């Protein structure tokens, strides 16, 4: 499933953008009777690689004991005001 429609860019920096992105992912999973425990892999793309630590602090709040595989890289041109893109793959039964 690909979600590409941007309704509003969250202001306030990397932390609120990561938080809202992860909430959006949770909501999509919920619509398919799945949870963050069903996520097997995430790719996190940052506009600025220096945001890795802050992104990671916010990201890990959404996973309790389950830690899916993750790839993170920075220096990407994501668009005006977009600081992070997170793509997750989930095993939905």
Which residues are covered by each model-predicted region?
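Short, polar/acidic, helix-capping and beta-turn segments at strand->helix junctions
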Residues: 1-93
